[in-house]
A protein has these predicted regions:
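Short functional hotspots at interaction and active-site rims
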Residues: 1-236
Length: 236
């Protein structure tokens, strides 16, 4: 290369890096220390997603990381209960594959629709006769039930309701179609995410921050501290 020339580099942002970790007040990071204060276990996961790289971060990887984090916490803080705090990202709120999803159902029984778990008709059901009763989400022949069957078993009259609105339901409506009506039932609304189930079954607590309030997220404080430290170092 001749003097004064520089190599032409590929355009782009370079390789992506994704870092997922848990922070706590006592240690800064969730780690397990030995007698000398050296880190022997940690919950941090680093991936390099993208073309020819690692798979993108998803719920499966998150759940595996949480399992590891719980084991580390139990070793580092025996006889203590952890409170895990998450924001409202889609991975954090992911439901299990057999979750109740009204808009994934057909109007009639069978057809191409996934099988959903059985449920209990909620105490808030409009018709008190069916409150608290178990409800199977499959027919006797093993086919997934459709919207109409599930609603009629709860005492609703669906004769004048369409299956689903197109393209979307009116924002303020709660009973514009069968799917919207069923989706507003308490057992469909109040479902537990896979993250929360994993944590509570291990004897710990889980808290999800309200949407659109990032100022409540402890990670924002960590990010601000890092930026302040970096700016101070650059100003020296």
């Amino acid at each position: 290369m001749r003097a004064g020339e520089q190599p032409l580099r590929k355009k782009g942002r370079g390789r992506l890096i994704h870092v997922s970790d848990f922070i706590n007040e006592e240690d800064g990071r969730l780690v397990l220390l030995d007698a000398d204060g050296k880190i022997i276990e940690h919950a941090r996961v680093i991936i390099y997603p993208g073309s020819n790289g690692d798979p993108w971060w998803d719920t499966k990887q998150l759940l595996a990381q949480i399992k590891s984090a719980i084991q580390i916490f139990d070793k580092a803080h025996p006889d203590c209960q952890a409170l895990f705090v998450f924001d409202q990202s889609s991975a954090h709120a992911s439901l299990p594959p057999d979750a109740l999803k009204a808009f994934a159902m057909n109007k009639s029984n069978g057809g191409k629709q996934h099988k959903q778990r059985d449920t209990i008709i909620p105490e808030s059901n409009l018709d008190p006769r069916y409150r608290g009763q178990p409800q199977s989400m499959t027919t006797e022949s093993g086919e997934p039930k459709g919207l109409q069957s599930v609603l009629e078993e709860r005492g609703y009259n669906c004769s004048n309701l369409k299956a689903k609105c197109s393209p979307v339901c009116p924002f303020e409506s709660k009973d514009c179609c069968m799917a919207r009506l069923l989706s507003q039932q308490d057992d469909f609304i109040n479902q537990t995410s896979m993250v929360e189930t994993l944590i509570t079954e291990a004897g710990h607590e889980c808290l999800f921050l309200p949407k659109f309030h990032c100022e409540l997220n402890p990670i924002e404080m960590v990010s601000q501290l890092l930026l302040t430290t970096l700016n101070n170092a650059n100003s020296i």
